[in-house]
């Protein structure tokens, strides 16, 4: 599907609902912003990342000091036989979004972004659930301090996606409408 989107192909038939008005985006489109964040990060910032150790933090700092011109160059310089590209990209996204080791815990809530009739029935029958579900980000972030932190990170992810797609933030997660299919 990603390749179809990149090439301008017919990808819509492979997704469950209409994405009208929602421009597809890829992290590459925010490459300059991401590279800036990487090049201004400290060793401590890298050490705070999930899945980062002393060796990787040193490797990141070494690449930062070489002033790579693009994200592709940055990633290639980090990647090695023992460090996969997927891991490198995940760590970069964690840094850009502000996700730290202590953020990776139990899921604090389930946010409903879209549903159909079947989903409506399932939610109505789920009386003894242990996880809070809602469509309102405001209600969900009021569950706990940790839920508020996760909601903040969720908003960061939306801002990154919108910056990549539109060059700026265009929506408010507190007023976002859910999709009913």
List each language-model region with its residue ranges:
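Active-site cores that bind ATP or allylic diphosphates and position pyrophosphate for catalysis
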Residues: 2-181
């Amino acid at each position: 599907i990603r390749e179809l989107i990149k090439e301008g192909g017919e990808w819509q038939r492979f997704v469950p609902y209409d994405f009208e008005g929602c421009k597809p985006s890829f992290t590459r489109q925010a490459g300059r912003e991401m590279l800036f964040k990487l090049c201004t990060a400290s060793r401590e910032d890298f050490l705070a990342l999930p899945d980062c150790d002393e060796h990787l933090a040193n490797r990141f700092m070494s690449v930062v000091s070489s002033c790579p011109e693009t994200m592709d160059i940055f990633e290639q310089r980090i990647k090695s036989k023992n460090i996969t590209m997927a891991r490198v990209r995940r760590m970069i996204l964690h840094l850009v979004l502000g996700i730290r080791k202590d953020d990776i815990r139990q899921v604090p809530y389930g946010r409903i972004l879209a549903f159909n009739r079947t989903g409506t029935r399932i939610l109505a029958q789920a009386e003894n659930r242990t996880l809070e579900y809602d469509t309102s980000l405001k209600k969900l972030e009021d569950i706990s301090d940790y839920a508020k932190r996760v909601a903040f990170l969720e908003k960061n992810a939306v801002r990154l996606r919108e910056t990549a797609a539109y060059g700026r933030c265009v929506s408010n997660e507190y007023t976002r409408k859910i999709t009913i299919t």
